[in-house]
Amino acid sequence: MTAEITLWSDYVSPYAFVAKAWAYQLEADYDVMLTWRPYTLDIAAFQGSVAGRDPHHWRRVRYAYMDARRFANKQGLTLMGPKKIYFARPIQTGMLYAQRHGVFRAYNDLAFDRFWRRAIDPENVAAVEALLLEAGAPAGFPDYLAGEGGVEHDRLRNEAEGSGVFGVPTFVLEGELFWGGDRVGLLRERLDEKGVDRRRAA
């Protein structure tokens, strides 16, 4: 039995970054079709301006990055906190462009790695196109972003929210949501319960 799983992700989320390896491992271990989709967090819209946030908020932010770094360090990853709050629509739409041209895995790895090394501005269209070219995609991303790609990105964001998604990473199996990389264990249990074949022993 093959299971279809949707993974909603955002390149500027530290938790999505560290969950990437767990998602790849899930695909390696189970007979699943894992479809990555961009869910772009508009942080300023739901958390307010930076100036308006209280000390309690910043304590939570500091803890979140400390926690994500624990997982990143275990994977040998570099996770440097971003210098500003981004609305990463360009780099997120790049995911769709990479999928269209068969270079998703290369782009996915590069996009996460470069952002968390502070080596790319996810809002810079030219920088995202250069990343796509490096991954093996053809030129043409700016037009795609300005046209059908941007429309599809926004449609998917609405679709995600309509299905209950509120954060990343979120795995969806037959309508059931598993939010956070630390829920992958529960997702694995659900796959076993449903009789999804394993590609190899756990």
Model-inferred region functions:
Residues 3-6, 12-32, 110-202:
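C-terminal cap of thioredoxin/glutaredoxin-like
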Residues 8, 49-53, 141:
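Short amphipathic alpha-helical segments at helix-loop
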Residues 17-115, 198:
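Structural alpha/beta surface segment adjacent to cysteine/selenocysteine redox centers
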